[in-house]
Amino acid sequence: MMETTENSMREIVIDKVVVNIGVGAAGERLNRAAKVLELLTHHKPAFTSAKRTVRDFNIRKGLNIGVKVTLRKDDALSFLKEAFYAKDYKIPVYSFDKNGNAYFGISDYTDFKGMKYDPDIGIFGMDIAIVFRRRGGYRIEKRRIKKMHIPKKMRISKEETIKYLQENFNVKIIGD
């Protein structure tokens, strides 16, 4: 008899991991935040700019106020292992959205393994976003010709994402 196996195209994979530091101002502090991201991810960060002017905070539209790095494939997996170590492998249940993505923050870059406080850099926290997708079929939403929506049965649920992180990264979910 044949044993039943899961369809490999329904397997969940990590699409990308986005690491963001929002500084809120341009200048030397922004450059130090970029240096922190480069030390942690070994990738050159991209600068994010303000979408609108806020006079109270002295921010003009188009002014660089943050840095981010997008990691994919093996780089994303290795960074996530370090990030979960910094969070003691515990993520709150409210960090997951209904689309199966996960978001959490790290309050200080010195929580990462092997990082020491540098007074020239200062203290920077960061936001981490993990975007999941199924192994196949997501191109139909992005392609130019015959665009379609992802069917409901192919969408990733919050529970599937939690199960994936528990199995692959030994993450404990707090607040179940």
Swiss-Prot record:
GO BP term, pick one: translation
One Pfam family this sequence matches: Ribosomal_L5_C
Top-rank taxon, per record: Archaea
GO molecular function, one term: structural constituent of ribosome
GO CC, alphabetical: ribonucleoprotein complex; ribosome
Keywords, sorted A to Z: Ribonucleoprotein, Ribosomal protein, RNA-binding, rRNA-binding, tRNA-binding
Family annotation (InterPro entries): Ribosomal_uL5 (IPR002132), Ribosomal_uL5_arc (IPR022804), Ribosomal_uL5_C (IPR031309), Ribosomal_uL5_dom_sf (IPR022803), Ribosomal_uL5_N (IPR031310)
Entry-linked Gene3D superfamilies: 3.30.1440.10
Coiled-coil regions listed: none
Known role: This is one of the proteins that bind and probably mediate the attachment of the 5S RNA into the large ribosomal subunit, where it forms part of the central protuberance. In the 70S ribosome it contacts protein S13 of the 30S subunit (bridge B1b), connecting the 2 subunits; this bridge is implicated in subunit movement. May contact the P site tRNA; the 5S rRNA and some of its associated proteins might help stabilize positioning of ribosome-bound tRNAs.
Similarity annotation: Belongs to the universal ribosomal protein uL5 family.
Subunit and interaction comment: Part of the 50S ribosomal subunit; contacts the 5S rRNA and probably tRNA. Forms a bridge to the 30S subunit in the 70S ribosome.
Descriptive protein name: Large ribosomal subunit protein uL5
Species for this entry: Picrophilus torridus (strain ATCC 700027 / DSM 9790 / JCM 10055 / NBRC 100828 / KAW 2/3)
